[in-house]
Amino acid sequence: MPKKDFSITIENDSNINHLNVKAIITENEIKYKESDDTITHFNYEKNILIRENKELKMTYRFSKNNKTEGTIEVKELQKEIKVLIDTKSIKRNNYNIEIVFEIEDNHFIYRIEELV
């Protein structure tokens, strides 16, 4: 499986998190490890983002101009929290992806950019 360099940005109204990673590319997914041992999978055919670490597993499904349900699993409590995701836009050019969405009046931008 090929590895490529990517710039990842997760931005909300009060914070911008940015990191550069080496990601594994498959025919429909980008997978990378964040600095805090969070493993992230983004399925770019189905627009599903999964971020998982020891404490949480977050699964967000995006559908352009639609509202979808996402889940946040709190592993220690064995509880699952449902969240409503309002996807404003999805832009994709090869492995460069930008998703603008809202969760409970909080505005987010998730960006994956291939570094050349």
Stretch-by-stretch model annotation:
Residues 1-116:
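Terminal leader/tail segments of proteins
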